Regions:
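Small-residue-rich hydrophobic transmembrane alpha-helices
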Residues: 11-75, 107-125
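Short alpha-helical transmembrane segments in multi-pass integral membrane proteins
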Residues: 37-102, 144-192
Length: 192
């Protein structure tokens, strides 16, 4: 983003701060989901694990829908919280609706990752993140932002594509893992 100038960088930081602020709630929900899923699996209660996953996904979807609507509906007042420079405010206000678009996907991807962590499924989610962010999102950002000249908005649309792909892939993995039999994990078989 720095290659596009100081206004682009400043507006990116404004939008990123707002997106990061709202992302903290889904991160907390993901952590809670991970713990509750792990406890349910440890107790041998797969239905409780499935309910925890559902509750986590519904919670983040509801919260991020509210933030998405806010980012889309009032981007200028939100940008003004961080800057009084009109060029920065205008540029950030152009990025916030894109952040609004990916808010729901961002919540879903982090909650899905938390649910999968609760059943000790970390390798596949890591690979899915690699595919979505690095092999799809980053090239799309570079293509749109630099090659096609869309600038910061293009970079953010690429980020949105990457987040969307990761969310879909992780939701697929959650469905795959939680619709079948969930086995209790044996961490140390030497304990009695």
């Amino acid at each position: 983003m720095g290659l596009l100038g100081t206004v682009a960088m400043a507006s990116h930081q404004v939008a990123l701060q707002l997106a990061a602020l709202t992302f903290m709630i889904p991160v907390g929900v993901a952590q809670a989901t991970s713990v509750v899923v792990g406890q349910a699996v440890g107790r041998g209660e797969p239905e409780a694990a499935r309910r925890a996953v559902g509750a986590g996904l519904v919670t983040v979807t509801a919260f991020m829908t509210v933030t998405a609507v806010t980012f889309i509906a009032v981007p200028v007042p939100l940008a003004r919280i961080f800057s009084n420079d009109q060029m920065v405010v205008a540029a950030a206000a152009a990025l916030l609706p894109i952040a609004g678009v990916f808010q729901i996907f961002d919540g879903l991807q982090v909650a899905s990752a938390g649910a999968l962590r609760g059943v000790a499924d970390t390798r596949v989610p890591m690979l899915l993140n690699l595919v979505g962010f690095w092999l799809i999102g980053l090239p799309v950002s570079a293509l749109l932002g630099f090659k096609l000249g869309a600038g910061p908005r293009g970079i953010w649309w690429g980020l949105a594509v990457g987040i969307g792909v990761v969310a879909v892939l992780l939701l697929w993995r959650v469905r795959q893992r939680f619709l079948r039999s969930i086995q209790r994990l044996v961490i140390d078989s030497t304990q009695t």
